[in-house]
Design a protein with these regions (language model features):
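Conserved loop->alpha-helix
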Residues: 1-208
Length: 208
């Protein structure tokens, strides 16, 4: 489980594909791997991945973290588009006592969104995203959504998708500042919204 509060950005050092598995190696500042064990969960661009190896670099400023990503994950997320030098959002899983500053995020990506518009304003950035039609009903005005793992509040919603308003803090901490028109972003809809809508629809269908 995660909070949707991005801790830092990591840099992709290597991407290799072998027998349906993508080996992803990222470099991250050493404090973010403190007491990190093999098998631990880390959200990379909001996608929950399992740590398979950790290697500290010679200068001890950074560490390499290894993940194996399966085909199903690559098909549902934007991780397959990563390349050397890409920046990814990084969040370690919740531990006892962690402040829940965003909303509860599972790390299970539902779909990807395409960036349709980017409007840069004086103190923020507006971004319009489109998502597959079947997921649109779970994105509600002023509701929560996780974008590349970042817990954000939904702005206006229309037939074309929905808008985000990105404040300077979000732009500074996450990789959304580097997003461009046509890029795809990982989407996890709010689990409570998802459950309520599905429950109501199921009930109404049984009554019909």
């Amino acid at each position: 489980m995660f909070t949707g509060i991005i801790q830092t950005q990591a840099t992709v050092e290597s991407v290799t594909n072998t027998d349906g598995i993508m080996r992803l190696i990222i470099a991250v500042n050493t404090p973010y791997v403190a007491q990190l064990n093999l098998g631990a969960s880390i959200a990379i661009n909001g996608c929950c991945l399992t740590v398979v190896k950790v290697v500290e670099t010679a200068n001890n400023d950074q560490a390499q973290v290894y993940f194996d990503v399966i085909d199903e994950t690559l098909a549902l997320t934007n991780l397959g588009k990563l390349k050397q030098g890409s920046l990814v959002n990084y969040e370690r899983s919740v531990t006892f006592g962690t402040e829940l500053g965003g909303h509860i995020v599972s790390g299970h990506i539902h779909c990807v969104a395409s960036i349709e518009q980017i409007v840069k304003q004086q103190n923020n950035v507006k971004m319009q995203l489109s998502i597959p039609k079947q997921w649109q009903k779970y994105v509600l005005y002023k509701g929560f959504v996780a974008i590349n793992g970042a817990s954000l509040t939904v702005g206006n919603v229309d037939e074309h998708g929905f808008w985000l308003h990105l404040i300077p803090e979000t732009l500074a901490i996450t990789n959304l500042s580097a997003a461009q028109l046509g890029d795809t972003l990982n989407i996890e809809v709010d689990q409570q919204t998802y459950t309520i809508i599905n429950t109501v629809e199921s009930y109404l269908s049984q009554q019909g």
